[in-house]
Amino acid sequence: MTMYATLEEAIDAAREEFLADNPGIDAEDANVQQFNAQKYVLQDGDIMWQVEFFADEGEEGECLPMLSGEAAQSVFDGDYDEIEIRQEWQEENTLHEWDEGEFQLEPPLDTEEGRAAADEWDER
């Protein structure tokens, strides 16, 4: 799992990875049908992004499906509004780091560490 500090960096990296995984296709001929994204909040409050592109709609990856068809192709082609993508993101799907390298939608409340993390998240 590789995370990036900006959504733009994550999209660029995912585009490069898609092309590397499909060696016979160049960027102009790529046919992308699905755009997946995942937002992370680290313990220090930094926000990180992970993005994936897929040639077939419905493919599963590490991230959540966000756009499909022409919308996914537009993002792949660089024709997108980062603010719009951020606004479309559903905050309840954001993963929070509660222990180093361990991410969850919510901290576990059955441990003192989890309760402390929940209190910190509530303060933000």
Swiss-Prot record:
- Biased composition of type Basic and acidic residues is found at 112-124
Q: Which Pfam families match?
A: MsyB
* Gene Ontology terms: cellular component: cytosol
Q: Please, which domain of life does this record's source organism belong to?
A: Bacteria
Region spans: Disordered: 96-124
Under the heading InterPro entries, the entry gives: MsyB
Per the entry, what this protein does is: Could participate in the normal pathway of protein export.
The protein's name is: Acidic protein MsyB
Q: Which gene encodes it?
A: msyB
